[in-house]
UniProtKB/Swiss-Prot annotation:
Name recorded for this polypeptide: Putative ribosomal protein uL13-like
Gene: RPL13AP3
MF GO annotations: structural constituent of ribosome
Keywords (A to Z) from UniProt: Ribonucleoprotein, Ribosomal protein
Keyword Ribosomal protein: yes
Family: Belongs to the universal ribosomal protein uL13 family.
Sequence intervals crossing the membrane: none
GO cellular component: nucleus; ribonucleoprotein complex; ribosome
């Protein structure tokens, strides 16, 4: 809970940014996983939890379909990027082997 009626709480709420999906300025940044914050580690199996997208839809948020399509596009781009990265790593390994032979 956040004390939104105090100046400090109001200031912290002003700093808060919440996104469903990954918006354009952040989609090109490298993402990292914090193992201690994973749902599997943090939540007990018997506890109920709620997803932000589902809650927003229940209060008549109308952009869930847009977010879903953008997320699919992002996943496709990430898949292509990962494939190119694998190809580059394979070529680099081959080049290192060729250098060691000579």
């Amino acid at each position: 809970m956040l004390r939104h009626k105090t100046k400090r709480g109001h200031a912290s709420l002003d700093c808060l940014k919440v996104f469903d999906g990954i918006p354009p300025p952040y989609d090109k940044k490298k993402r990292m996983v914090v193992p201690a914050a994973l749902k599997v580690v943090r939540l007990k199996p018997t506890r109920k939890f709620a997803l932000l997208g589902r809650q927003a839809q229940e209060v008549r948020w109308k952009y869930q379909a847009v977010t879903a399509t953008l997320e699919e596009k992002r996943k496709e781009k990430a898949k292509i990027h990962y494939w190119k990265k694998k190809q580059l790593m394979r070529l680099r390994k081959q080049a290192e082997k060729n250098v060691k032979k000579n």
